[in-house]
Regions:
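An amphipathic, basic-hydrophobic helix/alpha-beta surface used to engage anionic
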Residues: 1-74, 111-115, 129-130
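A generic short-segment signal for beta-strand/edge and adjacent turn/coil regions
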Residues: 24-26, 79-84, 107-111
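Short coil/turn residues that cap or connect secondary-structure elements
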Residues: 27, 51, 71, 87-90, ...
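Short, contiguous acidic/charged loop-to-helix segments that flank catalytic cores in large enzymes
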Residues: 29-32, 85-90, 113-121
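Short, charged loop segments at secondary-structure junctions
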Residues: 65-95
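Exposed acidic/Ser/Thr-rich ligand/metal-binding surfaces
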Residues: 93-134
């Protein structure tokens, strides 16, 4: 007996982009936010070609933008329009607020890609309990 696996189709995939002050940091001529935007655009394009649903969430101290995951042809254009208007904010990002909003708004099993920067391992460890990790 041999198990055969099929790739999942139409899986919701969300790019979650932190627009807080830590993403303003420069790296090789671009800000970390610029790299997050470029990566999320490239990944969204590939996912749409593979017939997955893609969505976008941007946040800092509050949720700034939410685009529900969808596989429509116009979805990449909507993502580009949302990303064009993203700028870094000065307040620190509120991960507790982010995770509570994600639990309410995303009820289907989804792939979440978080674009952020933790300046120290201690900053990462402070945020893990909010994500349900010990």
């Amino acid at each position: 007996m041999v198990n055969q696996f099929q790739d999942e189709k139409a899986q919701p995939i969300y790019s979650i982009i932190d627009t807080g002050r830590v993403m303003k940091m420069p790296f090789n001529g671009l800000s970390l936010l610029d790299y997050a935007i470029n990566s999320s655009l490239a990944f969204s394009n590939i996912a749409l070609k593979k017939k997955d649903k893609v969505g976008l969430i941007s946040f800092s101290a509050k949720i700034e933008s939410i685009l529900k995951a969808n596989a429509k042809l116009s979805q990449l254009q909507q993502i580009m329009e949302r990303l064009y208007n993203i700028n870094t904010q000065f307040p620190d990002s509120d991960f507790n607020m982010l995770y509570s909003n994600l639990r309410k708004r995303i009820t289907q099993r989804s792939l979440l890609m978080l674009y952020t920067n933790f300046e120290h391992i201690s900053a990462l460890k402070r945020q893990l309990p909010y994500a349900g990790h010990q």
